[in-house]
Amino acid sequence: MGIRAIVVDTAGTTTDLTFIQDVLFPYSVKALPDFLAQNQHNVLVENCICDTRDIALEPDADLARVTEILQQWVHEDRKATPLKTLQGLIWKQGYAHGEFTGHIFPDFIEAVNRFSAQKLRIYSFSSGSVEAQKLLFSHSDGGDLTEMFSGHFDTRTGNKLDKQAYANILNTISLSPKQVLFVSDVVEELKAAEAAGMMTCQMVRDSKQRTGDFRTINSFDELVID
C-alpha cells in the first residue's frame, strides 16, 4: 500500500518553537487592542469577538474586556478558534509589512521538495489557523512553499490531542490510515494519530524533549519514504 501522504505538525516540527513564542505571540498581544478597535465591525472579526464572549461566559464583555481575555489566552497558549483566527489576521499584516518572515527549518524545505518530487501529498495540521499556516509557508525564510502543500488543517478539524481529529483528516483526504504518516514533536498528538490508525514518527529536535514509543528522527533529512 505504502505512504501516499505526510501530515506535519508545525511548531517544533517544521518551525522553531521560539519563533512562535518569541516573535509571533508577542506581536499579536501588542497588536490586538488597535486591531480590534479598528476592525470590530468587520464581520469575521465581529464573529470572533462574539465567540470569545461565549467561550469566556462573559456575554456582556466590552471590547476592552474581550481584548484582555484574548491577550490572557495568548499567555496561556489557549487553542481557542476565535483567538487563532484573529492571530492569523494580525500576522497577515505583520508579514505584509515585512515585520518578520516565517521561520522554517532548512531540512524541511529540502524535504518538502523531495516529497513533492515523489508525488507524495503534504498537509500541515496546527492549532494555528489555516490562514496563519498559509502565511507561515508563503512568507518563509526559504520563499513561498505553499504550492508544495495539498492542504492545511486547524482546530476546526478537531483538537490535536483527539483521535477524532485525525479520523476527520483521513476522511477529508480520502486515504486509508496506513497510507498517511503523521510527523510531530508532541507525544500526545502522536498517540491520538496512532489511535486513528495513522503511521507516526516523532520529530526530536531537542535532546531534552520527552519521547514515546515511536520511531524518532532529529531532522527531515532522516525521513526517507520508499
From Swiss-Prot:
Entry's cofactor comment: Binds 1 Mg(2+) ion per subunit.
Pathway annotation from the record: Amino-acid biosynthesis; L-methionine biosynthesis via salvage pathway; L-methionine from S-methyl-5-thio-alpha-D-ribose 1-phosphate: step 3/6; Amino-acid biosynthesis; L-methionine biosynthesis via salvage pathway; L-methionine from S-methyl-5-thio-alpha-D-ribose 1-phosphate: step 4/6
Classification via InterPro entries: Enolase-ppase_E1, HAD-like_sf, HAD-SF_hydro_IA, HAD_sf
Coiled coil (UniProt feature): none
Biological processes per GO annotation: L-methionine salvage from methylthioadenosine
Keyword Metal-binding among record annotations: yes
Catalytic activity: 5-methylsulfanyl-2,3-dioxopentyl phosphate + H2O = 1,2-dihydroxy-5-(methylsulfanyl)pent-1-en-3-one + phosphate
GO molecular function, one term: magnesium ion binding
Role according to the record: Bifunctional enzyme that catalyzes the enolization of 2,3-diketo-5-methylthiopentyl-1-phosphate (DK-MTP-1-P) into the intermediate 2-hydroxy-3-keto-5-methylthiopentenyl-1-phosphate (HK-MTPenyl-1-P), which is then dephosphorylated to form the acireductone 1,2-dihydroxy-3-keto-5-methylthiopentene (DHK-MTPene).
Family from the record: Belongs to the HAD-like hydrolase superfamily. MasA/MtnC family.
Name of the protein this chain belongs to: Enolase-phosphatase E1
Gene this protein is translated from: mtnC
